[in-house]
A protein has these predicted regions:
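Short, low-complexity, intrinsically disordered N-terminal peptides in bacterial proteins
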Residues: 93-96
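C-terminal/domain-terminus segments
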Residues: 58-90
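Conserved ATP-binding subdomain of kinase catalytic cores across diverse folds
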Residues: 36-54, 59-68
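Active-site Asp-x-Gly
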Residues: 1-42, 49, 76, 82-85, ...
Length: 96
């Protein structure tokens, strides 16, 4: 795989893969959203040979920052989905 940023910016591959974790927000509405996010991060890592922990870290940053940004724009209900997922992931990571 070759990751290409549509804006022509050069970032580490894990950053772009972390954005994918953020974009799957609808799939995390289940009993264990953090487990689903980690499962997807492992899959992305296996497919691309990019470090799993780096993908998870960037995904976490993207999820929380998106939640904060949505809240600032007044989309409080949408923001809750992202911030609750961020909290679930943070809790899971501290247990690992």
């Amino acid at each position: 795989y070759r990751l290409v940023d549509p804006d022509g910016m050069v970032f580490e591959a894990a950053y772009d893969l972390g954005i994918l974790l953020r974009n799957w927000i609808d799939t995390y509405r289940q009993a264990d959203p953090a487990e689903e996010l980690l499962r997807r991060a492992i899959w992305l890592s296996e497919q691309t040979a990019v470090a799993k922990n780096a993908i998870i870290s960037w995904g976490f940053v993207e999820i929380v920052s998106t939640g904060i940004h949505l809240a600032e724009l007044g989309y409080v209900e949408e923001a809750k989905d992202y911030l609750q997922l961020g909290e679930a992931v943070a809790t899971r990571l501290t247990q690992m």
